[in-house]
């Protein structure tokens, strides 16, 4: 027997708006084997807008997310040939990131989850980077925990210990080590 989930993912941690729908299939007798299909992956870039100002303007980023979220979600559902009621869960980035951008994505996702009576799954942006190695192909690679990874993303540089999918922790920030020298 296989458990399937259709998950809508919302990403608004900085200046790009991302909406994706994935289908996961997990064999009940072998939960280590997860098959993933990316049904839709939509992105609205704000690079051109922010380039005029020499960098990301948080208030503009939040407004652009607000303009982009509903159309991108509709496009993702259409491209996936899904009715919103078919979704199993809604996942949303909850940090770290720009507060206004995160709140825009969270409020949109929470409203959608409440309207559809679906669970809302908070996602740590940095943990998403760490675990993204497992979704590079339709059949995800075997998860060999624990593992160490060096994470460099935006203003974050960290050495992360991943004990499991649910348990990751920062061992040390290389910047902290440099400052101590």
Language model region names:
Residues 165-181:
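Single conserved hydrophobic/aromatic residue that forms the stacking wall/gate
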């Amino acid at each position: 027997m296989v458990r399937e989930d259709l998950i809508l993912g919302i990403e608004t941690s900085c200046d790009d708006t991302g909406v994706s729908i994935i289908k996961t299939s997990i064999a009940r007798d072998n939960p280590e084997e997860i098959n993933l299909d990316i049904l839709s992956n939509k992105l609205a870039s704000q690079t051109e807008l922010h380039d005029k100002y020499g960098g990301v303007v948080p208030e503009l980023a939040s407004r652009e997310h607000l303009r982009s979220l509903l159309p991108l979600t509709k496009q993702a559902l259409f491209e996936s040939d899904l009715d919103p009621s078919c979704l199993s869960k809604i996942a949303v980035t909850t940090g770290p990131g720009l507060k206004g951008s995160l709140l825009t994505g969270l409020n949109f996702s929470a409203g959608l989850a409440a309207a559809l009576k679906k669970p809302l799954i908070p996602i740590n942006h940095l943990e998403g980077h760490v675990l993204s190695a497992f979704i590079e192909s339709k059949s995800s690679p075997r998860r060999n925990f624990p593992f160490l990874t060096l994470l460099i993303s935006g203003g974050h540089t960290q050495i992360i210990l991943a004990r499991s999918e649910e348990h990751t922790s920062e061992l040390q920030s290389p910047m902290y080590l440099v400052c101590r020298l």
